[in-house]
Amino acid sequence: VNNTDQTLPIFREYPGLGERLPRIPLGAFPTPVRKLECLDCDNLWVKRDDLSAAAYGGNKVRKLEFILGEAKRLGKRDVVTIGGIGTNHGLATAIYCKKLGIKCTLLLFEQPVTSYVKRNLLLYRYFGARTIFTGSLPKTVLAYFLTHRLFHPAAHYVFAGGSDVYGTVGFVNAAFELRRQ
């Protein structure tokens, strides 16, 4: 997936970078910046990444544009990621993988069960994610690396929260975006 869209601030700052970084547009950027009036602070602003996309907003959309772009560039048809049983990153990954026709597998570790965790568990299923409960965080990380090496080397692996090189590019772009705003 070659990205010739030069409208993102990072690509304006670094011409030619867009041709080397795979990206699939998933969100509407830039997101607005709003001054918080309700707190007792003179100058506190918030970047509204919750408005980044209609399907599922939030900062993970920024990361997934580049992560899933790389998965597509590599010809991967399955994405595997990890998180707690209520992971918002996992939910965003499931939603956008389904939208792009990519299978999604979530390796999940325990966390307290709250109403939002229950909601996310239902939504993973709704969006077609395969969920594997692996128990503790150490067991999940072990399963992540063993699955990759031994059982499913053809999948695209994304560490917790979309924390990889490609995901970071989305946040770097947000910094350039914020500077312009």
Question: Model-derived features: where do they sit?
Answer:
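PLP-dependent amino-acid enzyme catalytic core
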Residues: 1-181
